[in-house]
């Protein structure tokens, strides 16, 4: 129902408009208070890059974060990542991830980023505290924040917004009548707009998610997606239909598709009930970080990577590299650039 309301297919959004106006007023006042200096903005002696959304729901933000971290690491820069840690509940914050950290503590996305990149990752409700914790523990050149576009207490140097190219902004209204955290005009103030799927408009950077071979949760074996049939597909992400569409685009039609809520907490018995003996369970990589501890031999996940046009790489990275150079000794910065 909420998807129909947000897409504009249902007129029921009218009933929620009073709450949306209130949401919009509050968020505008919060941003205004930071811009006027009435609230403290925490700044740090290195570049902060925010990769965020204007809308609620999955837009492909985390693959962009993974791409950015990898690009900076390949150039020799020391990258840290901070996150709110949605879906996690740690005993204390800020929490620095290590080999003993679970998704129950830090959330699924931070754990996925840590496992994929090896970059130091910290989570905290106040992202500035997460940045401070990273800097106490590591020598870093740049920090990337996974989400947090609307977390104005954290000063930032670069802002990227990721948009779902098919859904874009839905009916255009603020939460809860629509999907918007901020209005579309906010795009005029960011350094890059990256569009996941669909058609990018002038000035936007097109991106697509490319699936790799499926990976077994227990053994790490990699196999071609088509060789896994029959498949039961599950997705506990912001927009499950995108995952199922990726499977069909890869030539696989699952015998069943089961959509869960974002940051779903799984149990072995729950997933066992979905799969017959001859079937294989296929999930997103984000789901896999929560299921690996109790996985079965027939459970697989599908990693995806952000693919951007070759010409966009330089345009996206140059402002970040310049910001790093400004914050580092000239010789050190030029050596890495």
UniProtKB/Swiss-Prot annotation:
Keywords: ATP-binding, Kinase, Lipid A biosynthesis, Lipid biosynthesis, Lipid metabolism, Nucleotide-binding, Transferase. Pfam families: LpxK. Pathway: Glycolipid biosynthesis; lipid IV(A) biosynthesis; lipid IV(A) from (3R)-3-hydroxytetradecanoyl-[acyl-carrier-protein] and UDP-N-acetyl-alpha-D-glucosamine: step 6/6. GO terms for cellular component: plasma membrane. It comes from the Bacteria. Transmembrane segments: none annotated. GO terms for biological process: lipid A biosynthetic process; lipopolysaccharide core region biosynthetic process. It catalyses: a lipid A disaccharide + ATP = a lipid IVA + ADP + H(+). GO terms for molecular function: ATP binding; tetraacyldisaccharide 4'-kinase activity. ATP binds at residues 55-62. Its EC number is 2.7.1.130. Transfers the gamma-phosphate of ATP to the 4'-position of a tetraacyldisaccharide 1-phosphate intermediate (termed DS-1-P) to form tetraacyldisaccharide 1,4'-bis-phosphate (lipid IVA). NCBIfam families: lpxK. Belongs to the LpxK family. This is Tetraacyldisaccharide 4'-kinase. It comes from Sodalis glossinidius (strain morsitans). The lineage of its organism: Bacteria, Pseudomonadati, Pseudomonadota, Gammaproteobacteria, Enterobacterales.
